[in-house]
Amino acid sequence: MSVPPDPDGRPWLLALHSSSESLGVGLQRLGAVAPERLETFPLGRSLSNGLFDCLESVLPASAWPRLGRLAVATGPGGFTGTRLTVVLARTLAQQLALPLDGISSFRLMARRLLTGPEPPGGDGPFWLLQELPRRGVVAGLYGADPGQPGGVAELEAPRLHRDREALAPHPIRPALVQLPEDVIQLLGFSGANAAEGRAAPWQPVLPLYPTSPVEALPC
């Protein structure tokens, strides 16, 4: 791929999402309102072997110095896929001295739902929930908030619950990744942060592991 020229010399915003069986990559000019490239790669367990090739098919390594900001979905998601993409994003941000926005995959889903035709919580908050066989449920609580980045408040970050009874009384929606739609949301979050001049150091950006083996199942 040849990188299209930009007469204003605006840098690129690159977004990576691997919290499902597929890798999503988005490329957008900082300050633009729409992505220039959106690609989905159904890599599954071969992500570790195909990650760099997929990234370079969207933006060649020779063009990485033209990046101005990075964004990555931090999960919850598969242990290996999420970890590899977050590590890659952190490495690029460190080596290129770029800001890095880490956004949970649940928060991206919430923004997609809130901007859809039927917001799931009406005027109030709602849960996003993922069922885990024999473990319980992973759920996060979200609501619309124009004062928050991307217009979405993460009222409770995704964590493990024994069952859905603890989630009353708010509405519950299934936590389902949709690509490339959720990559568009990731670009939107990061673009809004850039427009508002929000700092985004790479060091705090880490994968979310609600089902960590070192933590006991909630009572």
Where are these regions (language model features)?
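Short, functional N-terminal and low-complexity linear motifs
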Residues: S18-S22, V58-L59, P76-F79
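Generic alpha-helical scaffold signal
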Residues: R45-N49, W64, T82-V86
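A generic structural signal for ordered secondary structure
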Residues: L27-R29, A63-L67, L88-A97, A139
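Oxyanion-binding and handling regions
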Residues: M1-P35, P42-G50, D101-C219
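Short, well-ordered alpha-helices that flank and scaffold nucleotide-derived cofactor binding pockets
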Residues: S57, R90, Q94, T115-G116, ...
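DPxDG-like acidic metal-binding loop motif
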Residues: R69-S105
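Phosphate/pyrophosphate-binding loops at sites that engage ATP/ADP/AMP, CoA/4′-phosphopantetheine
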Residues: L55-R69, E118, P146
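N-terminal, well-ordered alpha-helical segments
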Residues: N49, D53-E56, V86, R90
